[in-house]
Regions:
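N-terminal Rossmann NAD(P)H-binding glycine-rich loop of SDR-like oxidoreductase domains
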Residues: 3-23
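N-terminal Rossmann-fold cofactor-binding loop
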Residues: 30-34, 49-50
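Rossmann-fold cofactor-recognition segment
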Residues: 41-52, 72-73
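NAD(P)-cofactor binding segment of oxidoreductase domains
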Residues: 63-110, 126-137
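Short-chain dehydrogenase/reductase
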Residues: 109-113, 117-133, 153, 163-171, ...
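Conserved beta-loop-beta element that borders a ligand/cofactor-binding pocket
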Residues: 133-163
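Substrate-positioning beta->alpha
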Residues: 165-173, 186-209, 216-217
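Mid/C-terminal beta-alpha module of Rossmann-like enzyme folds, strongest
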Residues: 207-268, 280, 285, 302, ...
Length: 342
């Protein structure tokens, strides 16, 4: 199989690239080359900016592919460009959408591909929905061979997955845990969530590549493991060998009090604060041997070990740390005041 990836060095795509090359497939990447250390050895690199359509078209002249995947398309305009570049050049075009596109607030915690798409809280999700609608129109009217993939919370060894963090990433929460500080958990920690290791995601995704039965379909790929946020944070604390000191704060308060640049209204109210259980029946029908095998407690131990042994992954976030302290202090003061007045 000859595949072309736009991107190819992110959390989701790295595991897919690695597995494809291990299995002997021919992989091409359109990549700006900003992270050369992350480029998989053995891949053919087209060093270009996908935003420069004329340059990319010239570099692709005479080429055709079995599969093209865009890992970095976020708007319908990106996909219109992809259609111009790749119609007639590929047998299948896979679009990475998002499970956050599903209806919020949910009418049913059980999620499958038939769940309506609507998210008034998050522009990111609305753009993904608009992208899906455009591609399905191109499939119906122009025969563009589209497959839409909806990941949920997919992680790798390079970052510990969490419910909330600042723009600096998750390390500051890990640091707070190691320092014995309280960490904020949205809600009361009992809502349900699913974490998927990127190597498991890769197995399902590769099973859709070149799969004629996946053309014109939308497919979600997640683990079948369902966890509460309390279980998630306890697993992280256990991996660190520390006690979890949780401070429970309502998602609405978090979203209202956090800087807008963190986009927690979208990330929480439009995604992680909702209880979800994913039904992967459709994926398993299309990819019969798909099974997610990395339990979260196993995957998070690998992530914690990697982060603690790689200083480049330890990005401190003083702004987020101060915000956590203020929120925790305000909640404790409010509770003390209510108790005193009662």
């Amino acid at each position: 199989m000859k595949a072309l990836f736009i991107g190819g060095t992110g959390t989701i795509s790295t595991a897919i690239s690695t597995k494809l090359l291990e299995d002997g497939h021919e992989l091409w990447l359109i990549n700006r080359g900003n992270r050369n250390t992350a480029l998989p050895p053995g891949a053919h690199i087209i060093q270009a900016d996908i935003g420069d359509e004329e340059d990319v078209s010239r570099r692709l002249e005479g080429q055709s592919f079995d599969v093209v995947v865009d890992f970095i398309a976020f708007t319908p305009q990106h996909l219109e460009r992809d259609y111009r570049l790749f119609h007639g050049r590929t047998k299948q075009f896979l679009y990475i959408s998002s499970a956050s596109a599903y209806q919020k607030p949910l009418s049913d915690y059980r999620i499958n591909e038939g769940t309506p798409l609507a998210n008034p809280y998050w522009e990111y999700s609305r753009n993904k929905i608009a992208g899906e609608e455009l591609l399905m129109k191109l499939y119906r009217e122009e025969g563009f061979p589209v497959t839409i993939v909806r990941p949920s919370h997919t992680y790798s060894e390079r970052s510990v997955p969490l419910g909330l963090h600042g723009t600096g990433g998750s390390y500051q929460v890990i640091k707070r845990m190691m320092e014995g500080k309280k960490v904020i958990i949205h809600g009361d920690g009992t809502s349900l969530w699913t974490m998927t290791h990127n190597t498991d995601f890769a197995k399902g995704f590769i099973g859709l590549m070149g799969n004629i039965h996946a053309i014109g379909e939308s497919v979600q790929i997640t683990s079948d493991e369902t966890l509460t946020w309390n279980q998630i944070y306890r697993a992280i604390a256990d991996a660190l060998g520390v006690e979890l000191r949780a401070c429970y704060v309502s998602s609405a308060f978090i979203a209202a009090s956090a800087p807008k640049s963190w986009d927690l209204r979208g990330a929480l109210l439009g995604d992680k604060s909702n209880s979800v259980v994913f039904d992967n029946t459709k994926l398993k029908r299309l990819v019969p041997d798909y099974t997610a095998t990395v339990r979260f407690d196993q995957g998070v131990r690998m992530a914690v070990d990697y982060v603690l042994n790689h200083p480049e992954c330890q990005r401190e976030d003083a702004e987020f740390d101060r915000w956590c302290d203020r929120v925790i202090e305000a909640q404790e003061e409010a509770l003390a005041k209510v108790r005193k007045e009662g």
